[in-house]
């Protein structure tokens, strides 16, 4: 009898800072898609993000601390070790080499990322290397309608993971931290 393939979720991001929303999405994807683990991959220099980013080594350490109590979550510094901007294609190639052909990969992304996927570097190759999970708020499927259609035109599909809406964002957390306001129960 053949062994079942491993199913690995990849949750990449700036994590500027990591917060409960990231952890909730990872946990829900783990359960909904029968993943063996979720790998958090903080970006050193994210190509699609703002420049007001907490220093990479601190973001990496924050993510490590945030996932410590969950044995199904691990953190990879693969993008931190690269010079310059890091692209998802390079990260997925790395994980394919590490885990081998008996592993299926699922790239977990939020609504804003899903909307921008068609513009990503090497997106066509990415479609061959992983499946995508779009973590969206209830009723927000219309927000990614064009992306769903785009996936369909390429013979691919995107899995939808409806997550509870949280009025919490990394931008709001940075604002609170800058102004000395409490972030208790948010991080």
Question: Which residues are covered by each model-predicted region?
Answer:
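Nucleotidyltransferase catalytic core that binds NTPs
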Residues: 1-187
């Amino acid at each position: 009898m053949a062994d079942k393939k491993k199913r690995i979720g990849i949750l990449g991001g700036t994590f500027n800072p990591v917060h409960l929303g990231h952890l909730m999405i990872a946990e829900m994807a783990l359960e909904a898609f029968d993943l063996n683990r979720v790998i958090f991959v903080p970006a050193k220099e994210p190509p699609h993000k703002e420049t007001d980013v907490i220093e990479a080594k601190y973001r990496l350490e924050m993510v490590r601390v945030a996932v410590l109590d969950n044995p199904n979550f691990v953190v990879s510094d693969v993008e931190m070790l690269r010079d310059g901007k890091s692209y998802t294609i390079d990260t997925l190639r790395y994980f394919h080499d590490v885990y081998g052909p008996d592993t299926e990969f699922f790239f977990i992304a939020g609504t804003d990322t899903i909307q921008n996927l068609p513009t990503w570097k090497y997106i066509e190759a990415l479609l061959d290397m992983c499946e995508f999970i779009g973590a969206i708020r209830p009723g927000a499927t219309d927000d990614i309608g064009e992306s769903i259609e785009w996936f369909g035109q390429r013979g691919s599909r995107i899995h939808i993971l409806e997550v509870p809406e949280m009025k919490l964002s990394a931008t709001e957390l940075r604002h609170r931290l800058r102004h000395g306001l409490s972030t208790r129960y948010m991080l």
